[in-house]
Amino acid sequence: MSTVSQDGGTSRLRGILDPATHDAIMAAAERIKSLRCKRIARDEVNQPTINNWLEAMGIDNPRFKAGEAPPTMAQVWTMYGLGGKAGPDDPLHAMMNVLTEAGFTGVLGTNSEQKYDRYLRVGEHVRVETALDSIVGPKATGMGVGYFVTSRSTWYVGDEKVASMLFRVLKFIPKGAA
C-alpha cells in the first residue's frame, strides 16, 4: 500500500499509513492552525528564578545579577509548571493528541529556532501566544515513520514583542510497532 505525502504524491513507506488517515491528520492540522493559545506568565520576571537558572546552567554573568534576565529564559516564564497541563486551545498539544490517536506514539524534540528582540527585566510580566506553524509528513526516519510538527511561540511584554521561537518535534510510529 502507498501513502500520501504532503504534496499529494505517493511515496513508498510500506503501508504504514493509509491515505484516509493522512487526510484526517492534515484536516485536523488545518483546524488546529486556527487556534491561538494565549497565556500570561504566573510570575513576573524575578531575580530568584534568574539566580536558580544561572546556577543550573553554570553561568556567572554579573549582567544577570543586576536586573536583566538571560534571553534564553523567555520560555521559562510561561511554562505550565510541574502540575500544569495544556488547555484545549494549545495548538502543539492538540496536534500531538491527534497524532497519538492515529498511532504515532513516539515523540522526539528535533530542534528550535529562537530569536531574542531584547533582554527581559526584573518586574516585567510576560505573555506568550502560540500557534501551529506547520506539519510535514509522513516521512520515513531512523526512528520510524512520522510527522514533523512545528509550533510558533511569540513572547510579549505589553504589546512589545520580546522573543520568538519555532519548536519542532517528530511524532512517529516507533520502528517495529507497526
Language model features with spans:
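Hot-dog-fold acyl-thioester-processing enzymes
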Residues: 2-111, 178
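HotDog/MaoC-like acyl-thioester-processing domains
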Residues: 2-30, 111-178
